[in-house]
A protein has these predicted regions:
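Outer/extracellular conduits and scaffolds centered on Gram-negative outer-membrane beta-barrels
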Residues: 1-68, 84-86, 90-359
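Surface-exposed acidic, glycine/proline-enriched linker/cap segments
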Residues: 71-87
């Protein structure tokens, strides 16, 4: 950390209240005292810091780099030169987070255990490169402590154990649900609101919105310059019937980067579940575990799905063809093409057509 920059203080506190051990009215009621072994509420709040950074740890330093040099005199000899590199961030500090948690713990009937927590994290002073500084300044700049994100949700587990004769068993369910959002990241002012990452979840994918396939009638309108012709991509490769068709979000008649918006869900599950079951009988024991993640999207591209990538898939049999279109058959894939730069390429034109949502 650079000289003169103070490290902000961090700390935390927690409180808990165990009703069973503190309240006499529980002990005065036999059923409660017998069947509820633990009933506790707790809460905590704290500010924590992190000095983990990626790459350069000396962001506060001004960087100078070797330049192209200059020729002096009559002989061809280049004299090295130096130029400014990325501007330093003199008051860089660690990233911080305000963490709040409230929870409930219960033990019932000497068999059931329950733990549930709600959490809310506000992360701020996150190190990111500013996107709102114009490149006209002619020099790079180091990351700044400017970004802010919110993460909140709940998690917990429920356990049950019992015995039947010589057979002991236990089962356990764990769960977690969390949502996050970018509050601020100093991104450049976007021409259209749907291009902004601020206000979206972390790792939100952006791309085109698929609205169907170009039809032979669409191609006729495009070639004739009809006013109601659908928008076409900004490329030298003309579209053909059976190509994927995307929404023209700004209604300018061209499919380009200005038509990219948030598609699908982040590739980070918001919900995770797990279930385990175990038993013991006369020296034999076993355990099984199932777990899953839900509420996220992932993209399929390349050899896994695109045509002529040496991986013929069953879905390619449901591709667009003139015959299928005329017969009104179900079509689930665009026309096959070996050109990797067409509008049908997931690498060149990423869209929600290529996304799979996990519940």
């Amino acid at each position: 950390m650079c000289t003169g920059t103070a490290l902000p203080g961090t700390g935390s506190f927690s409180i808990k209240y165990s009703i069973i051990s503190e309240e006499s009215f529980f002990k005065d009621v036999d059923w409660l005292e017998k069947n509820i072994q633990l009933l506790k509420v707790r809460a905590s709040y704290g500010v924590v810091g992190s000095d983990v950074t990626s790459g350069n740890r000396y962001l506060y330093n001004q960087v100078y780099q070797t330049g192209d040099g200059y020729y002096f005199g009559d002989y061809p000899g280049q004299t090295p030169s130096y130029k400014e590199g990325d501007l330093g961030t003199p008051h860089v500090t660690w990233e911080k987070a305000k963490k709040f948690d409230v929870g409930l713990d219960m033990n019932l009937f000497d068999k059931i255990s329950l733990t549930v927590d709600y959490f809310h994290d506000k992360r701020y002073d996150q190190l990111v490169s500013r996107g709102d500084i114009p490149v006209i300044i002619g020099i790079g700049h180091s990351p700044n402590n400017i970004a802010e994100t919110i993460n909140q949700g709940f998690d917990g587990q429920i356990s049950y154990q019992d015995r039947f004769g010589n057979f002991d068993f236990n089962t356990n369910v764990v769960f977690s649900y969390a949502k996050n959002k970018v509050k601020y990241k100093a991104e450049a002012q976007q021409k259209y609101s749907w291009l902004a990452e601020t206000g979206k979840p972390l790792n939100q994918p952006f791309g085109y919105k698929w609205v169907g396939y170009y039809t032979p009638e669409d191609i006729v309108k495009i070639q004739s310059g009809a006013k109601d012709a659908p928008a076409v991509p900004y490329t030298d490769i003309p579209v053909q019937a059976g190509d994927l068709k995307y929404a023209d979000l700004n209604n300018d008649g061209t499919i380009d980067d200005f038509d990219k918006g948030a598609i699908g869900k982040p590739n980070l599950p918001s919900t995770t579940l797990g279930w385990s079951f175990g038993g013991y009988w006369k020296g034999f024991s076993f355990n099984v575990l199932f777990q899953g993640s839900f509420d996220y999207s992932f993209a399929i591209n390349g050899t896994g799905i695109e045509s002529f990538k040496s991986q013929f898939q069953p879905i390619h049999q449901k591709r667009w063809t003139q015959e299928k279109y005329e017969k009104g058959e179900g079509i689930e894939f665009p026309r096959l093409t070996s050109n990797p730069s067409t509008i049908n390429s997931a690498s060149t034109y990423m869209s929600d057509f290529w996304l799979i949502n996990a519940w």
